[in-house]
Amino acid sequence: MSSSSWLLLSLVAVTTAQSLTEENAKTFLNNFNQEAEDLSYQSSLASWNYNTNITEENAQKMSEAAAKWSAFYEEQSKTAQSFSLQEIQTPIIKRQLQALQQSGSSALSADKNKQLNTILNTMSTIYSTGKVCNPKNPQECLLLEPGLDEIMATSTDYNSRLWAWEGWRAEVGKQLRPLYEEYVVLKNEMARANNYNDYGDYWRGDYEAEGADGYNYNRNQLIEDVERTFAEIKPLYEHLHAYVRRKLMDTYPSYISPTGCLPAHLLGDMWGRFWTNLYPLTVPFAQKPNIDVTDAMMNQGWDAERIFQEAEKFFVSVGLPHMTQGFWANSMLTEPADGRKVVCHPTAWDLGHGDFRIKMCTKVTMDNFLTAHHEMGHIQYDMAYARQPFLLRNGANEGFHEAVGEIMSLSAATPKHLKSIGLLPSDFQEDSETEINFLLKQALTIVGTLPFTYMLEKWRWMVFRGEIPKEQWMKKWWEMKREIVGVVEPLPHDETYCDPASLFHVSNDYSFIRYYTRTIYQFQFQEALCQAAKYNGSLHKCDISNSTEAGQKLLKMLSLGNSEPWTKALENVVGARNMDVKPLLNYFQPLFDWLKEQNRNSFVGWNTEWSPYADQSIKVRISLKSALGANAYEWTNNEMFLFRSSVAYAMRKYFSIIKNQTVPFLEEDVRVSDLKPRVSFYFFVTSPQNVSDVIPRSEVEDAIRMSRGRINDVFGLNDNSLEFLGIHPTLEPPYQPPVTIWLIIFGVVMALVVVGIIILIVTGIKGRKKKNETKREENPYDSMDIGKGESNAGFQNSDDAQTSF
């Protein structure tokens, strides 16, 4: 047999083997899809029941259903790993196997998987049920939603915002801290079991794309693209930041630095994520009609159902389908009135079997009106790819899913659209001033959140990589917050806190970079859809409602789900394969030009050294080695606890003796910041149970003076090795003369004048006496040699005796 015949037979054999492998894989996937949909639905339904009725019973049922789904998925994942991807030629089969070969948390042992689920459920419960009590009215204890969110959205009282902000992090964040530490360890272990470097690397894997002709994209490119686009956006953000800072100085004149960072609790919501609620304080042209239509919605009697009905009308107007009957029957669109504890954070649910729902404690506001469009955008995406195989029912990447609803929000927020649905009056006229008002409102929501998102995810990526030890989580968090976002903590936080986990997405295990990438994508999509709608004009004025051409172009992309590389799906809509920030910058260009003009005489950027509590802080410097030599001990967290407790003791003593008040200061009321390795730091003191009441520095100094010796003795140091800079180094208060300094000086001068007069008088008397003596006979003792210093005291004139002045 010729060599060519052998080659032909070999190729046939290989092709036959590949065909059998692919056929077996296809059969396996068909069986998986049928069984997976049922088990996934039961798990999702149990999760829905828990999120809409938080009870121990529902938590247990959710855990049981999740365990069944996890066990099934683990088994199927192992089977999928037996198929060689090199032998699979059909792309859609290969993509499903690739997805299933990633076993997720099933890669952990059964015990660790159970532990991880318990941690996640506990964190979710703490977040959803956490309460903060008003220090001025301890009986008034508020959930985040509704309650604290209202304070953070509307209050302009600095101290009210502060106790809500701090209380949420103290009550919830501190409880989450040990759980989040365990979560990081287990998630990293899970990621490595799935052949990723860490959990951040695992998350970024969602952006990987394989495909011919340049559609490839690796997860490291995501980091590069995020860094690149953020650098392009930063100048716009810096000018927005400078403008907002100047406006906030009008509302909080004593609490804002004209060159410093912005206090985190003044930025519109609990996290400073969206600055939307700052619009009333920063509106450029307040005399113009209000483009925030909240009042119009209230006056017209809108409710939650009306909000979602209007959102549905928008999607239908571009040719997308109505919501299902089950959606309206099963969704939770308002907070239940029956007292159930629920997770209010808005989420869209694709439970499977055509069951689509939204969970949201809707309020009648423009912000919630736009949020409804966003969440319904998720549902539209879910419905569009519902015919894809189970494993491909997802967005092209996570950012695509978030972007779809945001596209609709861009159009729904335009004055043109609001006018068309009666939320702006028919005689509303757009001009350059209303244009700037509109763009600023959009920027507060869209541009203001980008550094927040970027910085949060960068911090988590560094934590998962082990680049930030857990002993420095909060220190690094606030350093990065100051440097990247230009935001400063209103109170210093030590390592007992877990401020990142005070955000829903962190405590509930969501990747967050999706909210950054979605913002870039949404403007790319918007530009392309406006072109499809044959719109000519400024991008920020485009409203694609009623354009079925735009809707069909979008639907084509949505229907793909995750069956194609996201780079290809993006190209199908926008004609490009990568993130491009230019459409976003074009959208905001008129505002950017205006902001630069407004900021001509303002400092643009921020000084990271400034803090709201700097004026009341006292610096401490400790010299252990110079004081104790070989006996010097290490300054640890325990030593810091002892220091704070000692100051708390001093404050109790001072208030008891000087003010005749019993005030139960604790170590937690002594706020320490800026700890340096050479042992120096700052501290100030707040009232117990009321963080917004800062004790004046002068009173803290008096308390330290009163107890200085006791504090020194605790650490075996003295005034020179335990320095309170600015406080006199003595056990007693500095000497205060009983009369003023000028009076003392005047007295000294007058005394010298009197003494001078006396000397002149005495000298005159002596001179006269000497003249009289020359008339007497010669002194018999003139021949005596007195050069040797001898004198006869018996004959010394009493007036010549030496007397000290």
UniProtKB/Swiss-Prot annotation:
Biological process (GO), any one: positive regulation of L-proline import across plasma membrane
Region called Essential for cleavage by TMPRSS11D and TMPRSS2, residue ranges: 697-716
Biased composition (Polar residues): 793-805
Entry's Gene Ontology molecular function annotations: carboxypeptidase activity; endopeptidase activity; identical protein binding; metal ion binding; metallocarboxypeptidase activity; peptidyl-dipeptidase activity; transporter activator activity; virus receptor activity
EC code(s) of this entry: 3.4.17.23, 3.4.17.-
Keyword Glycoprotein annotated: yes
Top-rank taxon, per record: Eukaryota
Domain Collectrin-like positions: 614-805
Locus of motif SH2-binding: 781-785
Residue span of motif PTB: 792-795
Keyword Signal: yes
Binding site for substrate: 273, 345-346, 515
Region (Disordered): 771-805
Signal peptide: 1-17
UniProt binding sites for Zn(2+): 374, 378, 402
Tissue specificity as recorded in UniProt: Expressed in heart, kidney and forebrain (at protein level). Expressed in the small intestine, with expression in the intestinal brush border (at protein level). Ubiquitously expressed, with highest levels in ileum, kidney and lung. In lung, expressed on vascular endothelial and airway epithelial cells. Also expressed at high levels in lung secretory club and goblet cells as well as in alveolar type 2 cells.
Sequence ranges assigned to domain Peptidase M2 in this UniProt record: 19-607
Cysteine disulfide partners in this protein: 133-141, 344-361, 530-542
Record Pfam families: Collectrin (PF16959), Peptidase_M2 (PF01401)
Name of the featured protein: Angiotensin-converting enzyme 2
Phylogenetic classification of the source organism: Eukaryota, Metazoa, Chordata, Craniata, Vertebrata
Name of encoding gene: Ace2
